[in-house]
Amino acid sequence: MAKIKAVILVIPENFGKHFTYQALIHSDRAVLIGVKNEPETQEQVDNLKALVDNVLDPVRELIERKVYPHSGFRSEMINKIVGGSINPPSQHMKGEAADVTFKLNEGETYLSVAEKIRESKIPVDQCIVEKRGQSQWLHLSH
């Protein structure tokens, strides 16, 4: 008989000033195929919280507008499906990265916002403009 392993994760009630836990684990792809996309370890949850506190909330305040996470945490399955890095593991799988979009002001580009973030004191280790077709977003990690 297989042993069942129970893991209890502590999810902070107030996950951030501008972001919710649910927004950071939501995956349209996971919903579409009917699988869960949730952290399995407390370390992943803690990393997501640190990402919000140290990067996402400060970026939201720096650019003074809503920031929409489109790909925060990714389970191993979702990461494989979307073509994320496996070796080394994607920072999304560790809870250390999020792909975000926001409304651009007139004359602004994702590149100019990325430069503004890099010049700030926000501790990002990656601030990358990514694009697919006409869509663009920022990959932010901590």
Regions of interest found by a model, annotated:
Residues E76-A98:
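Short, surface-exposed glycine/acidic/tryptophan-bearing loops
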Residues M1-L62, G133:
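Extracytoplasmic cell-surface/polysaccharide-interacting catalytic and binding patches
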Residues Q44, L51-V55, R65, I78, ...:
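Amphipathic alpha-helical interface surfaces
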Residues D53-G84:
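Extended, low-complexity, intrinsically disordered C-terminal regulatory tails
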Residues E40, P69-R74, T109-E115:
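N-terminal start-of-chain detector that recognizes signal peptides
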Residues P89-H92, F102-H142:
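Catalytic cores and adjacent binding grooves of peptidoglycan-active enzymes
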Residues V67, A98, W137-L138:
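A broad, low-specificity signal marking well-ordered, structured residues that form hydrophobic/aromatic
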